[in-house]
UniProtKB/Swiss-Prot annotation:
It holds the Pfam family MP. One of its GO terms (cellular component) is host cytoskeleton. It is found in: Host cytoplasm, Host cytoskeleton; Host cell junction, Host plasmodesma. This is Movement protein. It comes from Tobacco mosaic virus (strain vulgare) (TMV).
């Protein structure tokens, strides 16, 4: 069963283009292309993990240009029997940022009893094409109180992004304002049965601790390598964090196809 619900991403929910930008050919407007990426997947096997995610999968970039991550739709499904206890926090991370509170772009909390969940994130910031090719985004996942034997996959996540590719810097308005996601906030994005730990510990603090632990392990590994003169492959550590300053909304609006799509444009 596919994780993503059939249907199209509604680009107008992320980007507010002017009438002129919609009507004029691309050669007469700074907006060259609004695109939806291919679906990227993460299979979560560890309780705490920091995973690479390709939010620009299938997106055609412009040399010496920019790409704006206007919006992101995340769909998750618990691979568990009904009415299991526990829950998860999912956080989008910009790995370029060294301060943990600045690296966390937004977070979402839900319980394992919620079999399938979906939320929307509005990062609305641009990076250069050169940085984009380095795959700068990660996903921090923290699962608590889910009792499953090691080596199995309790949770699957899928990601589809809406981005704008252009040569020159532009300013685009958003149809919705950025909000902090908390239980009882302006948008109800958490379940009542979610464990209290998810609200008590900010994801930025979890990210800082995770980075500190993995950094120490990396130093120990380097010391062993120099003494044994033998290379040791790096493990792909994963983690979860708190989304500060992002707007999420439950909405069934992802495309299940594996192809990137282009909208509101005729050329690059």
């Amino acid at each position: 069963m596919a994780l993503v619900v059939k249907g199209k991403v509604n680009i107008n929910e992320f980007i507010d283009l002017t009438k002129m930008e919609k009507i004029l050919p691309s050669m007469f407007t700074p907006v060259k292309s609004v695109m939806c990426s291919k679906v990227d997947k993460i299979m979560v096997h560890e309780n705490e993990s920091l995973s690479e995610v390709n939010l620009l999968k299938g997106v055609k970039l412009i040399d010496s240009g920019y790409v704006c991550l206007a919006g992101l739709v995340v769909t998750g499904e618990w691979n568990l029997p009904d009415n299991c206890r526990g829950g998860v926090s999912v956080c989008l991370v910009d790995k370029r940022m060294e301060r943990a509170d600045e690296a966390t772009l937004g977070s979402y909390y839900t319980a394992a009893a919620k079999k399938r969940f979906q939320f929307k994130v509005v990062p609305n910031y641009a990076i250069t094409t050169q940085d984009a090719m380095k795959n700068v985004w990660q996903v921090l996942v923290n699962i608590r109180n889910v009792k499953m034997s090691a080596g199995f996959c309790p949770l699957s996540l899928e990601f589809v992004s809406v981005c704008i590719v252009y040569r020159n810097n532009i300013k685009l308005g958003l149809r919705e304002k950025i909000t902090n996601v908390r239980d009882g906030g302006p948008m109800e994005l958490t379940e009542e049965v979610v464990d209290e730990f998810m609200e008590d510990v900010p994801m930025s603090i979890r990210l800082a601790k995770f980075r500190s632990r993995t950094g120490k392990k990396s130093d120990v590994r380097k010391g062993k390598n120099s003494s044994n003169d033998r290379s040791v492959p790096n493990k792909n550590y994963r983690n979860v964090k708190d989304f500060g300053g992002m707007s999420f909304k439950k909405n069934n609006l992802i495309d299940d196809d594996s192809e990137a799509t282009v909208a509101e444009s005729d050329s690059f």
